Every structure is written in structure tokens, then in C-alpha cells.
């Protein structure tokens, strides 16, 4: 299940987060399909002064945008999440609008809502070519026939680079391996009446949330592992990759220290899969410079936190000529031709 994170270092990403929350409610109502949302609240943990100061800045940004976040003490952290050892922390920033959702349910809800509003989508229909016509529109070639479109948007995900290459465009994104673990049942969770909050520890580079009667623990290692630098195979079917726990061993040491129950609990499954980053970690959205009617929305690594806001921003940009917020930190135009694979 997807984890919703509301703390982000740039204002543009912060501004689109509320749009995602509104989108979740809208697509449930329109589609009749649950997105499996658990609004547990979540906290962002500061273990030293550097991260405490960082969270103070983030809270200031949140207040500026009307988002409600508040600091709580380590004691309050332990009261809300008794598996956490509070002695490692100075403070935590609490967000009562955080939580997680079911990515499969959310995807179906988006698809059903789109169809209600007149959109069409075609599964198992690969795009093999994109050809611009003299009037500026595009022919999108598929094995089932051509689709003519006024505007095309590269939302290729792991295949964003390959879709761009169809038109001679270099999209500077790179898939990276990402690990997370699912634990066996933890007695304290099994006995709890309410679902536990989710959390992020910035120094440890870990995030965690309840999964059934255990925990999901994810890591962001400081030395990430690129995947398929030469290009994503067209026949890749989102298969999982071989886990490499040595790669995240130092992150796990932090986790076992700060959530002691993890050291005493079995690992039910270790999961490793690729997802895509831009060079600075932010999405790359908007019209591609030098092209007509060619847009992109790629590198959205925090998909279910940012996806609805990215979609709204793109729609405003296309329909009104500009988005309602300043998206400089996400504009694809911030990277020029110099952002090549060699770079």
C-alpha cells in the first residue's frame, strides 16, 4: 500500500499535496470504488538539531499554505506509537492528514472516474510510435490502430526515456532500486484497537507504517542503486528484483535501534523494485521546450502523494495557459539539453 507523505522540501510539491487529498474523495464518490484510505496521521521524527531545524522550516511553509501540522514531544510520539523508542528523538512534526491507501483500488477509482467523465483508456495497448502531423496534432501508433490527439503527454513512468526517444527527446530520469520489508505479526499491533500512525525518520532514512498486524519498513539508502541505465526493456512486467539486504544494512541498524520490536520480529517478505527519479528528486512536468503540443509528467516518485496535484496542475496549464501555482521546482524546462545520459 502507498504511503502519503506531506513534508517536502519545496513549496511546489507541498502545494499539490492538498489537491491529492481532494482527488481521493472525489474519485471515490464518482466511481463508487474505495481507494482504501487509512487516515492514521503521521509524524516526521527529528533525532538531532539539524533535522529539528529542518522540520521547523517545513512547519512554517505548511502554515503559510494553510496546512495544519504541529510539533509533539518524544513522549507523545511513544503514546501514539508505542513501538518507537522515544529516547532517540528531540521532537516530531505531526500531521493528522497523513496515512496510506490501496494503490490498486486508487488506480481503478481513477480509471472508473475518468470513464464517467468521457475519457477512454486502452489496456494491453503499447504505443510503438508518435508522429506529429502538419497541423501540430499527433498520431499515436498502436498495434490496434492509430489514435489522433491534439496534445500528447509522456507519462511513461519506467519507460519515460523510451517514449521520449520515439521523438528524439532525452528525458533525464533514472529508475532506482528501492527496498522495503514486511514483518511477521507483532503482538503489540495485533492487540491494538486502533491503527498505528505512519512515520519517517530523516536521519535513519527510513519510513514505516502498519501493514496488517505487522509493519512495513522502507529505506532510502544514501548510495542508491541505479536500475537499467541503458533503458527499460519493453517487456518488463513490473517483476520484483532480487533483494540486496547488504545494501540497506546500515539503515536497518537504525531501524532496529529506534523501533526495537523490529529486531525481535521475523521478516515475512523483502521487496525490491524499481521506481523513477529526476536528477533532483522532483517531478518533471509541463510542455517540453522546443516541441509543439508535447508534454510530460514523469519522475513522480511520490505517486499517490503527488499524482492528483500533478494532474490538476497539468490540466490548468493546458486549459488556462498557466498553472495556478508556481511550479518552477517541477517544470521540465529546468533541465536543458545538457542533462544527457553522460551527464
For each predicted feature, which ranges?
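Helical element adjacent to the flavin cofactor pocket in flavoenzyme catalytic cores
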Residues: 92-151, 159-162, 308
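Helix-loop-beta segment of a Rossmann-like dinucleotide-binding subdomain
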Residues: 33-44, 58, 78-117, 139, ...
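Dinucleotide-binding Rossmann-like beta1-alpha1 core, especially the glycine-rich loop
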Residues: 1-80, 203-207, 212-216
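Short loop/edge segments at beta-strand edges and connector loops
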Residues: 39, 73, 123-125, 269
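Short beta-strand to alpha-helix junction loop
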Residues: 14-17, 45-54, 93-116, 122, ...
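Short Gly/Ser/Thr- and Asp/Glu-enriched loop/turn motifs at secondary-structure junctions
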Residues: 38-42, 176-177, 270
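C-terminal catalytic lobe of FAD-dependent flavoproteins
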Residues: 203, 212, 234-343
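Flavin-dependent oxidoreductases
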Residues: 10, 129-241, 250-258, 337-343
Amino acid at each position: 500500500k502507498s504511503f502519503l507523505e506531506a513534508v517536502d522540501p519545496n513549496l511546489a510539491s507541498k502545494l499539490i499535496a492538498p489537491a491529492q487529498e481532494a482527488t481521493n474523495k472525489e474519485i471515490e464518490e464518482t466511481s463508487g470504488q474505495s481507494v482504501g484510505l487509512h487516515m492514521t496521521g503521521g509524524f516526521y521524527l527529528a533525532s538531532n538539531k539539524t533535522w529539528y531545524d529542518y522540520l521547523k522550516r517545513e512547519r512554517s511553509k505548511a502554515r503559510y499554505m494553510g496546512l495544519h501540522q504541529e510539533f509533539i514531544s518524544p513522549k507523545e510520539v511513544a503514546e501514539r506509537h508505542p513501538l518507537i523508542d522515544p529516547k532517540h528523538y528531540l521532537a516530531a512534526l505531526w500531521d493528522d492528514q497523513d496515512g496510506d491507501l490501496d494503490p490498486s483500488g486508487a488506480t481503478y477509482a481513477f480509471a472508473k472516474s475518468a470513464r464517467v467523465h468521457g475519457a477512454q483508456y486502452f489496456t494491453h495497448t503499447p504505443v510503438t510510435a508518435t508522429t506529429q502531423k502538419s497541423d501540430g496534432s499527433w498520431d499515436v501508433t498502436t498495434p490496434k490502430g492509430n489514435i489522433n490527439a491534439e496534445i500528447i503527454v509522456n507519462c511513461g513512468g519506467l519507460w519515460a526515456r523510451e517514449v521520449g526517444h520515439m521523438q528524439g527527446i532525452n528525458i533525464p530520469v533514472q529508475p532506482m532500486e528501492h527496498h522495503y520489508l514486511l514483518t511477521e505479526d507483532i503482538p503489540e499491533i495485533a492487540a491494538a484497537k486502533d491503527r498505528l500512525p505512519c512515520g519517517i525518520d530523516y536521519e535513519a532514512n527510513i519510513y514505516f507504517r502498519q501493514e496488517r498486524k505487522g509493519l512495513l519498513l522502507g529505506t532510502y539508502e544514501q548510495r542508491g542503486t541505479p536500475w537499467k541505465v541503458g533503458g527499460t526493456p519493453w517487456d518488463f512486467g513490473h517483476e520484483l528484483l532480487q533483494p540486496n539486504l547488504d545494501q540497506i544494512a546500515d539503515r536497518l541498524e537504525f531501524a532496529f535501534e529506534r523501533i526495537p520490536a523490529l529486531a525481535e520480529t521475523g521478516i515475512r517478505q523483502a521487496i525490491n523494485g524499481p521506481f523513477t527519479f529526476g536528477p533532483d528528486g522532483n517531478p518533471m512536468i509541463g510542455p517540453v521546450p522546443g516541441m509543439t503540443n508535447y508534454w510530460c509528467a514523469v519522475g513522480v516518485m511520490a505517486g499517490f502523494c503527488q499524482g492528483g496535484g500533478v494532474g490538476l496542475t497539468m490540466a490548468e496549464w493546458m486549459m488556462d495557459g498557466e498553472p495556478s501555482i508556481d511550479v518552477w521546482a517541477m517544470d521540465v524546462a529546468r533541465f536543458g539539453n545538457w542533462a544527457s545520459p553522460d551527464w
